[in-house]
Amino acid sequence: MACNIPNQRQRAMSTSGESLYEILGLHKGASCEEIKKTYRKLALRHHPDKNPDDPSAAEKFKEINNAHTILTDNSKRNIYDKYGSLGLYVAEQFGDENVNTYFMLSSWWAKTLFIIIGLLTGCYFCCCLCCCCNCCCGHCRPKTSTPEEEFYVSPEDLEEQIRTDMEKDMDFPVVLQPTNTNEKTQLIREGSRSYCTDS
């Protein structure tokens, strides 16, 4: 079974942004009023209902309609003027707001920077080590102020500490009981605050 391929070459994406203006017979930077006026004139001339015998009239009408749709939309027109039909294709794929980012990242200097950083970091291996492992197997880890041995407390020392704390508590019995509180009791006394329990 043979494939139905048209004899026409598929249109290449332009980056100049002039072919839609040429379809309407205008210069780049034409005003919206000029675009509308020219569109009406060409649409009437190439409308398929007015040219039923001409099969190319329908294709020409579609091209004119497409050019008018793009050039009357300010966002699409700005993208087309700056990046051409390739910019419109990128806008369809990634959204209008990401067109500038796409072309910036696909520029020669961004690709070069990406390659240089990749080479300097060993295919980005050092970047992973900096984020995950404090770089170079921990050699760049921040130093702690006290050695780790001081954090170890033997069980005997811990028991001795508990005994001495209990003996101190027995020497000083609780003398004051908490007072009853209600809604009118002030939680913070006016005057100087004292955190000492000795009276």
Curated annotation (Swiss-Prot):
Annotated ranges, domain J: 19-84
Localisation per UniProt entry: Membrane
Post-translational modification: Palmitoylated.
Modified residues (Phosphoserine): 14, 16
One cellular-component annotation, GO: membrane
Primary location class: membrane
Membrane topology according to the record: Lipid-anchor
Alphabetically ordered keywords of this record: Chaperone, Lipoprotein, Membrane, Palmitate, Phosphoprotein
InterPro entries: DnaJ_C_subfamily_member5, DnaJ_domain, J_dom_sf
Subunit structure and binding partners: Interacts with the chaperone complex consisting of HSC70 and SGTA.
Protein name: DnaJ homolog subfamily C member 5B
Species: Rattus norvegicus
Source organism phylogeny: Eukaryota, Metazoa, Chordata, Craniata, Vertebrata
